[in-house]
Amino acid sequence: MFLKTVMERNQPLVRLGIEWQQNGVILPDTYLLDYDTILENARSIKQAGDANGVQNFFMLKQIGRNPLIARALTDMGYVGAVCVDFREALTMVENQIPLGNVGHLVQIPRAALKKILRAKPVIVTVYTLEKAREISAVCTELGLHQKLMLRVLGEGDMLYSGQYGGFELQELDSAVRAIEAMPNVEVGGVCSFPCFLYDEAAQDILPMPNLRTVQTAAEMLRARGYRDLMLNTPSATCTHSIPMIAAAGGTHGEPGHGLTGTTPYHAGHPDAEERPGYLYVCLLYTSPSP
């Protein structure tokens, strides 16, 4: 899907990949990251976020949780990393990279809670009251206070296989009351995934039903007196989609493939702001023609 795009929009990276592989500088089965292009993309995304009042946590799991790029992004002004699984969070902690949102797709296991919570993430996503209680207990023991993001589910939401879980809207009020009784934690926001996806027929990034679920959950929390909530509305976050996030009332995005210019939107739009920023180098052997 992206080979034509990267050949058209980042020819120097393609030429370098071929040259280095042929000269033995890199081995086959290597991901080659274009540091400068990734940072250019990140700068465009941050500028769009700043202009629209949307804060972005950067996601680097697609490019190996690269700490060098993570440090450059924090130096650029990004608040921190979104770590959808605990291994990514631990990698960032070990490299002194600030944590933004942790646990959105894979909940933090109990054995990793102390190390990750000591790093003081901006917010931690929880699917269940059991996980909220675990975080409350660890924060109480460590003398910390942690904001929690509630992953919410609504009827008709789009969910990927293996990524089910969260608080259904009809149980949200009782869940919030239970969390309000827990020490050292507080509800700080709501999220779902994916809230936006590229639609090939429309040739554009469009909102998913999940977005309305997040909006409804936020309305329910505001009715309970909550203010300054984080509405995290990820997937396909890039310069093009950030105004959509803002228009929907979202406060946060999570650019990942947007940073490398490799969302489906970028494959179909050669005029997109972000350019392809990485390449997979491999060898393909073909039999000679008879």
Q: PLM features: residue spans?
A:
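Active-site-proximal beta-alpha core segment in soluble small-molecule metabolic enzymes
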Residues: 57-199
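Active-site loop/helix belt of alpha/beta enzymes
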Residues: 154-273
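N-terminal basic/disordered segments at the start of proteins
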Residues: 2-12
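Short coil-to-beta-strand transition motifs
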Residues: 274-281
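N-terminal, Lys/Arg-enriched amphipathic/low-complexity engagement segments
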Residues: 27, 35-38, 45
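Generic N-terminal amphipathic, Lys/Arg-enriched alpha-helix
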Residues: 14-31
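Conserved small/polar residues in nucleotide/adenosyl-binding loops
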Residues: 285-290
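N-terminal glycine-rich anion-binding loops that anchor highly charged ligand groups
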Residues: 41-45, 52, 56-60
